């Protein structure tokens, strides 16, 4: 039992990531463990954040919400109700799309957050801060949520995107002529 182990160390918050796809059989034991964990500690002491993909169809220029609705219905069928839905997408979600996800997934509209594709992975935390993920999560847990100072993080990303110097790196190997041999 996971929660019995972490409580002995006076942990106040545990973040547990369950990877994979809701419908995959490999995920089932982990999802059941999450359901039981939330039941044992109480809904007020655990929130569930569901990260899902909102595909964009370029041909029709539309975002598709059905895969998200289906995965949430699968979770609900297992006794799991997400508190927050983070929607990965290459295009911004408008209020209509967020409202549709809110309605059909039984989540408040301000708990439907977009996570747009980013150029640099390190931009993702800034994108989540812009969507107020921490504030929404803290609100669900009835915790105070001071505004973080992300200026150092922003400086790091700026340095990554705008390097001061160029460096040449030699790649020595047997198969360097193949374009993906050492990726």
Q: Where do the language-model regions lie?
A:
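N-terminal beta1-alpha1 cap of cysteine-dependent amidohydrolase-like domains
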Residues: 1-13, 18-183
């Amino acid at each position: 039992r996971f929660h019995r182990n972490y409580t002995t160390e006076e942990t106040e918050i545990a973040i547990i990531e369950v990877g994979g796809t809701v419908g995959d059989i490999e995920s089932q034991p982990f999802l059941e463990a999450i359901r039981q964990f939330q039941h044992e500690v109480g809904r007020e002491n655990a929130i569930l954040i569901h990260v899902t993909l909102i595909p964009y169809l370029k041909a029709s220029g539309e975002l598709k919400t059905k895969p998200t609705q289906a995965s949430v219905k699968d979770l609900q069928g297992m006794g799991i109700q997400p508190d927050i839905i983070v929607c990965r997408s290459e295009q911004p979600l408008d209020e209509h799309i967020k409202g549709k996800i809110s309605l059909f997934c039984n989540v408040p509209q301000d708990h439907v957050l977009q996570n747009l594709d980013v150029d640099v992975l390190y931009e993702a935390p800034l994108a989540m801060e812009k969507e107020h993920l921490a504030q929404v999560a803290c609100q669900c847990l009835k915790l105070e949520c001071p505004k973080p100072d992300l200026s150092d993080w922003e400086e790091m990303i700026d340095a990554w995107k705008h390097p001061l110097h160029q460096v040449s790196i030699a790649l020595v190997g047997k198969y360097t002529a193949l374009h993906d041999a050492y990726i």
